[in-house]
Amino acid sequence: MLSIKQNKKHRGSYAIILIAVCLVGVGLYVLALAVSPSVAPLIFTKPINAKALPKAKNGENRIVIPRIGVNIPYGKGRVALDRGAEWRHPERGNPKDGGNFVIAAHRFSIQPTPMGTIEKSPFYNIDKMKLGDNIVVDYDGARYAYEITKIFEVKPNQVEIEAPSEEAKLTLYSCELG
């Protein structure tokens, strides 16, 4: 009888240890999800040479930002945002006709895997961009080049950044990190 009670005691200890190990493992996994976009440029992201990019294809609209390792498709609507970036208010501008060409993408979107989090957080490092950085946009089978001339932060209610413009410009934006 005494040995049976001791075994039950050990089973309880093993169960507690197993639960603790599982909780630590889950915590480490969640931490990996949270930090994956910040370490991606160091580990996963290959440098982008804008001059070596394949020729723009008809029907494939892309935005390439070498400084932060972004090479993603963009399009109209929320579905496009889930695939890469959203072209906001297409009627207000595009690379070919000018106006305010507005592109928005997620800054941070946690996903079930670290690679998924990286892929769904293309503008995570948007704050690392600098004046003079180049941006390449493929639109309607042609390639357009932009250079950053102004960087500023806006509040979520400052929608004037999407306003129509006589000046041909590209506006990039994303939400701030929590």
Regions found by a protein language model. Name each.
Residues 13-24:
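Hydrophobic H-region at the start of alpha-helical membrane spans
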Residues 25-178:
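Solvent-exposed, non-transmembrane regions of membrane-associated and secreted proteins
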